[in-house]
Amino acid sequence: MLFKSVLLSTLIAVQALAENSAHQEIVTVTKTTHISNPCLENYAKKLLPNNPTGLTTGIPIVIVYAPQQPDNQVKQSESLQPTQSSKAQQQQQIQGSSVPASIHDTPTPTDHTKITVTSTTICNQKVCTVKTFSTIISHSESPTTTTTTKQNEEKSIADTKSFTHKALPSSNGAVTLKTTSVKTALTTTSTVFSATSLPSTTYTPSTSVSLVSTTKKNPVSSQSVVSTTKTISINTSLITDAVTITKEATTLPNSKHSSIFTNGSISFISTSANKVKSTVTSDISNNSQNGSSLSLTSTINQLASITNSTLTTITKPTSLVPDFSYTNSSRVSSTMRNSSEESSMVLEKSSSKLLSSTSFLNSSSIASTTESSELASATTSDSSLNHSSSSSVELSSSLSSEADSSSSSESVETGSSDETASNYSGDLFKAIDTNAPPTVFARSEIPLTIPAGVDNNGKPIGTNKFYTNLLLGNQDFMVYPLPYGLYWSKTSYYGFAVQHNNVSDRVFGSINTNNKGVASYYFNPTNNAELIFSATSFSKDSMHMKVSQMAELSALVTLSSSSNDESNYLDIPLVQGMGFVTGIYNGNLTPLLNSLFGVKDLSLETSDALLSNVLKYRATLLNNVQWLIYVTLPDKDTDFKLEVEDFYNLKGSKPVDGLIIQVAIAPEDNDNDKYYDAAAGMYVTGATVSGSVSQGTAASYKFSYTTAGKSSSNNPIVFALPHHMDSLTGSALDALTGITVTSTTKGEMTGFLTNELEFSETINQDVEFLPWTENMTGSLTYTKDQLELLASAANKELAANIAATVKNMNSNYFSGKVLDKYAQILLVVSEIIQDEEVTKDALNAMKDAFKVFTQNKQYYPLMYDTKFGGVTSTSAQDGDPNADFGSAYYNDHDFHYGYFIHAAAIVGYVDKKLGGTWAQSNKDWVNSLVRDASNPSADDTYFPVSRMFDWFSGHSWATGLFVTYKNIESSSESLHFAAAIKLWGKVVGDQSMEARGGLMISIMARSFNMYFYYKSDNTVEPKQILPNKVSGIFFENKVDYTTFFGTPADHPEYVHGIHMLPITPSSSLVRKTSYVQEEWKDQIAGFIDNVDSGWTGILRLNQALFDPKSSYEFFASNNWDDKWLDNGQSRTWSLAFAAGALNAS
């Protein structure tokens, strides 16, 4: 009876809708929706609300009921990762008078994501509108059931506007998305050509592999340092107790706040309209009852006039009462303890408002500065602190406004925002600077010839972009805007070739590996021209290519018969994520489509769902792969058609100025043609990246596609990568098509009918300079014994002439690593050991070392390249582009510069806490490195936008101007760059840069764990390579478990360690505990005992991310040997990192 009631209710609803129009009929198609018996009635009521039971319409309805199945047997009808099967031949036939039925497709197995589709079709005569709900279930989660909403009355022409709503998450990880309305209609198929016999020979793709050369220099080195004798060192005997470091203790002074007090130090800032001289005396009574009362007397004499003001009493907020813990050679340090006592501040009013606000932040000295039209500097004298009790201390200091401009006690405002980093809201892509780079970078050109026809209209040219191969050599290497691969075909057939990627075509192999029986690589065959955009006038001797409009995510290829033909040309826009490959024929070109494989069948498909000026063809190649070909005419033209000349040539019947030809691999399910139909005629011409952040943590970014042409949906079709799907938001949530296309090395891409893809991410603000792992639950704490060992290691490692050491290194990569190593030692001395005297000595040494580079006196000075627009190495000016790791030709810039920027951030941070302005004084030089590798805005015309980081791919491409496929060998050094600009932005007050670095880290956390780091449950990469645990070199079209400097057969530590170094607080944001532990267990544990070099320390510090106890024991061993350290790694930092992680876990 229950089943009968549901059936009757269904019939009632159909009749009610049918009566709205004499010609309108409703067809509801539900694909493989599994529901249990108890919910059947509720399900029907949701579909047909407000309809009484028992009413009969007489219209036959078929309801297919599937009994409840075990969870592991429930399968979905469509998949975001379909297997590669032959295309269905049956065309969709929807007619108003047909009997609707529930269609159950053959289940498709999937590893990554499943999709179930429930669709409702509204038909009027020949034209139907399909509304669809799609449920995406990531990572093989259990499916959920989705339902249609009440249908709006539709006219025969589909309403194509999108419906804005957020994703609907469920408890099992599914997200329900709604597609844009699209039209479908009766499709009539007519055969244009069908082969009755096959050619005697057919094209077979090459599966030969090109081995990676492993002759590059090892990036881990143990070059000797220039030693020196230090007169100042940490007195370990004065370390008497443990230390705990709070977040407040590492907060930088903010120039918009005027008073600073932490760790027993005071920085007092007064505000005036003019320069002033200041004298401040302070006294904290030993008899203070609550430990938080502070008396200050301040007399300020203005230059032009005198204004007296007395600060009579400040009672410090008791949540920041110093809790003194230990002494060392130069100061009494403190940490902050909580108290419930209240605070108050009493100020005597004066004619000038001298204090705007009070805050208590971390400082290591007493400083006095004045905000005015010009900033006056102040010099801090040494402070004497006598530890009397936990709540009282005597302190006196004298401050003078006379200061050396280079003194570490200078204090000046940096940054332009009134907001602190923690609550910054605004643009993520503000220009860093729009002025020319400093003149210290000599103007010159790298000795690389740009081919004729490459012209970016005076704008900087991206050197690490997907289109770079079109600028190099013979210009015939493939490019991968994704999901398709393309190349300039200059032999046999002449034009621009297109190929798709098929899982079944991947080539796996194993060579020079430590994992016997496991594939060490896979790749996709190249230069397989399934279709070639050409024209009858193109030939070997009469074809010219131009490359122009090169931007962050796009470029334009133009083919013509000669370089001076400005009237007859073929434009092919290349845009990352483009759903069609599009050719626009201009002038008197007769279109020609070639195929290396050959065409077996060509059919014309007509439908009222297509625009009247659009022709749709389906071409089946001799390899049984089907392609959709859409021809859009400027006006409806009944005379134009595609004709088959032979197996390998499809020719347009005549030239048409403005003709558009678009091709796409046909969907696995022919029913999904409707989305390509809805997008046909519109194509993407470019894309930009924009984004914003709210309150410092909630970030969003989006790809906005520019379009040309017209489609029935008023939208183009674009594709997103797997790492995009989990963070997708905005209007794209309503634009899912269910179409998937296989990428080269990044799994399945998903199609959307939209001109905008928007994503949301959360920025982690807790991770900054000091040690952090995701397992740390407590405060950063160090025992007395650990501090003594840290101090001993620091004393030994700081006995070096840092400037002399880095000056003579024959690579900016190595010198940058060494500079960063000493910066981290400085950080430990300043923040953990807290020895002020040694901190100042090390800080001055670091400043001297930086002068080598800011004055451009290193082994390979830097220059500004006026040809491509960038700050790059002069190492190739003598003819060797491979010197300095190829840096001159823009290889590894983020790796190299990340070390300098990170070191500068630490130096600036420590110096700023001491009241100095080193960061401000050197900001232009450091920012030039940031701008070169990561310029965020086209407003900065001296550098290309985002040279290294590919916002679409979710990671950087290291390879610069070398004829090969884009690749990245060290994911961790790319991460280090993002962390560096985040910290540098924090130090100089550039909140946009700081947040942008944080966003890059969040994006990499997604992409790295899908494409580079392989847990056993990874569902994006092929299962054949997962036991390797790491990608090795990740190319655009290949994953190769090796390195450029050695193979895992001999040195497995190379391929694993290059994705670890350097270990910093940001490492654990990306290298998740579960992954690191699995990699160690399955791989590293098997060879770690055989590693006896600088790689040992890298692997062991990585161990701290999941096993800090063993890591610390290694670095604290009595049998310690410095040979286990790379030049870029110190024992001091390694001990601090491992101990901090151990004690707080």
UniProtKB/Swiss-Prot annotation:
Active-site positions on this chain:
892, 969, 973
- Which is one GO molecular function term here? glucan endo-1,3-beta-D-glucosidase activity
* Reaction catalysis annotation: Hydrolysis of (1->3)-beta-D-glucosidic linkages in (1->3)-beta-D-glucans
As for subcellular location, the record says: Secreted, Cell wall
Q: Region Disordered: what ranges?
A: 73-113, 325-345, 378-421
Q: Which GO terms describe its biological process?
A: adhesion of symbiont to host cell; cell wall organization; polysaccharide catabolic process; septum digestion after cytokinesis
Source taxon at top rank:
Eukaryota
User: InterPro entries per the record?
Assistant: Endo-beta-glucanase (IPR005200), GH81_C (IPR040720), GH81_N (IPR040451)
Q: Where are the transmembrane segments?
A: none
Keyword Isomerase appears in the UniProt entry: no
Please tell me where this protein is predominantly located.
secreted
Bias (Low complexity) occurs at: 81-98, 327-345, 378-419
| Uppermost EC category | hydrolase
- State the signal peptide span: 1-18
Q: What is this protein called?
A: Glucan endo-1,3-beta-D-glucosidase 1
The lineage, from the top, is: Eukaryota, Fungi, Dikarya, Ascomycota, Saccharomycotina
